[in-house]
Amino acid sequence: MMRHLLTLFDLTPQELRQILATAQTLKAKLKQGERPAILERYTLALLFEKPSLRTRVSFETGMNHLGGSSLFLGDDVGWGKRESPSDFTRVLGQFVDAVACRAKSHERVEQLAEYNAVPIINSLTDLCHPCQAIADVLTLLENFGEVKGRHMVFVGDGNNVSRSLALACAMLNIQFTLARPDGYELDQPWLDRILAKYPNAKMNQTADPIAAVQSADAIYTDVWTSMGQEAESIARRAAFKNFQVNEQLLEAAPKTARVLHCLPAVRGEEITDAVMDGPQSDVIEQAGNRMHAQKALMIQLLRPEWIAENIRV
């Protein structure tokens, strides 16, 4: 059966741990100058409807490290414009071995998976951002060795990033708290789906960020206004003004707490320069972990036998 990664629900907790262990192994090898050509002769298509820095570069560089190749497909290919979605998708699958898709709507990625005979990777949609969440928990794992029982606090919106992060935390037995203004909660259908799959998950939402971070192992934030929400920017700035990750908030947290941000950041809004560039920040390392996490994910989808033979969890 063809494997896709549309959401983290497509992975088991054991598979997620295997991906994390593989990412750690590949990262260690790269630091030693080793680039095992595990995906030699494989080609990845990057099909993007939205602009990107980290996602595009991390996938392209990661595929290069693994001995494979990649090609970028932008608006000029006419996805959904010049021919039927099923024709476009099935033809694309004749030329490449996998597709990483960054789409405006999650339905577009589901459509790709419905018609395609190669693995589809959701590299960002309006619903969720699974690749980011894998990099996030990889960063937590690097800091603490074991993530079970740790506490992740997301200060911000119940958006695509926090949806995937909440699910990743449930899969790995990490407590998850969303600190947000009223009206910006995680949607109940998503929470219900997580709790139906992982009934022992510890998940909370609060409008008090100071209280939320007092037992935090990681404090995570994101922009207050995402792409496509520009018309809401004034209302959002007003709603989130007391949810900035700043020095005052960090003082309420344990000294060992790490600071995360998926980037790009609007410095001075959701996070201050002092915190983002401070000693507790792992933001840049977290961004770099996108590549290592995605390399491991591509191996999981394209050559799972390599992980079975070489990685122990």
Swiss-Prot record:
Superkingdom of origin organism: Bacteria
Keyword line: Amino-acid biosynthesis, Arginine biosynthesis, Cytoplasm, Transferase
One GO term (biological process): arginine biosynthetic process via ornithine
| Residues that, per the record, bind L-ornithine | N160, D222, S226, M227
Primary site of residence: cytoplasm
Q: Which reaction does it catalyse?
A: carbamoyl phosphate + L-ornithine = L-citrulline + phosphate + H(+)
Gene3D superfamilies cross-referenced by the UniProt entry: Aspartate/ornithine carbamoyltransferase (3.40.50.1370)
**Which terms does the record give in the GO molecular function aspect?**
amino acid binding; ornithine carbamoyltransferase activity
Any Pfam family the entry gives: OTCace
- Residues where carbamoyl phosphate binds: R102, H129, P130, C131, Q132, C262, L263, R290
Write down the EC number. 2.1.3.3
GO CC aspect terms: cytoplasm
Q: Which InterPro entries does this UniProt record tie to the protein?
A: Asp/Orn_carbamoyltranf_P-bd, Asp/Orn_carbamoylTrfase, Asp/Orn_carbamoylTrfase_sf, Asp_carbamoyltransf_Asp/Orn-bd, Orn/put_carbamltrans, OTCase_ArgI
This protein's pathway reads: Amino-acid biosynthesis; L-arginine biosynthesis; L-arginine from L-ornithine and carbamoyl phosphate: step 1/3
For the protein in the UniProt heading, the enzyme class is transferase
Q: Where in the cell is it found?
A: Cytoplasm
Q: State the function annotated in the UniProt record.
A: Reversibly catalyzes the transfer of the carbamoyl group from carbamoyl phosphate (CP) to the N(epsilon) atom of ornithine (ORN) to produce L-citrulline.
For this protein, the record's HAMAP family field holds:
OTCase (MF_01109)
NCBIfam families for this protein: orni_carb_tr, PRK00779.1
Q: Which family does it belong to?
A: Belongs to the aspartate/ornithine carbamoyltransferase superfamily. OTCase family.
- Official protein name in the record: Ornithine carbamoyltransferase
The root-end lineage is: Bacteria, Pseudomonadati, Planctomycetota, Planctomycetia, Pirellulales
Gene label: argF
